[in-house]
């Protein structure tokens, strides 16, 4: 007869569940990607391994509200709260994209208490590469 599988939420195997590896990170990199439709904030260590991330969509904003500055501020606050608890004190900020959430996300990062070593704009700019799509007629 087959053995019954243990329940996932049972009291016996509560230490067996996967638990996120909590490690002390003194310095990290905060990547902010602000498009017109959404803002994604990713916190990595200096080697580029993702520690925490958040976006306006995961914070509960839907549709056109995801592109607002308030949604970007909320997403940045959510992503940074976890790394501040892990002990991050210094960070570099890389901002990419033309969206409305750029400044709001940066304001939320400044308010978090992390010392910023530098803020860099890494928006990709073509040196007259591909032809852009035709202009919208509304």
Curated annotation (Swiss-Prot):
Pfam families reported in the protein's UniProt record: Ribosomal_S11
Transmembrane segments: none
Keywords for this protein: Chloroplast, Plastid, Ribonucleoprotein, Ribosomal protein, RNA-binding, rRNA-binding
GO molecular function: rRNA binding; structural constituent of ribosome
One record GO biological process: translation
Residues making up the signal peptide according to the UniProt record: none
Entry GO CC: chloroplast; ribonucleoprotein complex; ribosome
InterPro entries in the record: Ribosomal_uS11, Ribosomal_uS11_bac-type, Ribosomal_uS11_CS, Ribosomal_uS11_sf
Location(s), subcellular: Plastid, Chloroplast
Subunit structure: Part of the 30S ribosomal subunit.
Protein family membership: Belongs to the universal ribosomal protein uS11 family.
Protein name: Small ribosomal subunit protein uS11c
UniProt organism field: Morus indica
Gene assigned in the entry: rps11
């Amino acid at each position: 007869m087959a053995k019954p599988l243990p329940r996932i939420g049972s009291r016996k195997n509560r230490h067996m569940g996967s638990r996120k590896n909590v490690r002390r990170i003194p310095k990290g990199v905060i990547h902010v990607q602000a498009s017109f439709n959404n803002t994604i904030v990713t916190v990595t260590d200096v080697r580029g391994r993702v520690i925490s991330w958040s976006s306006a969509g995961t914070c509960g904003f839907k549709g056109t509200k995801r592109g607002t500055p308030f949604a970007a501020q909320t997403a940045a606050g959510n992503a940074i709260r976890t790394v501040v608890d892990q002990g991050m004190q210094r960070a570099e900020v890389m901002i990419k994209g033309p969206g409305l959430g750029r400044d709001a996300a940066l304001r939320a990062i400044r308010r978090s208490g992390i010392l910023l070593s530098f803020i860099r704009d890494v928006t990709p700019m073509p040196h007259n590469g591909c032809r852009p799509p035709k202009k919208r007629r509304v």
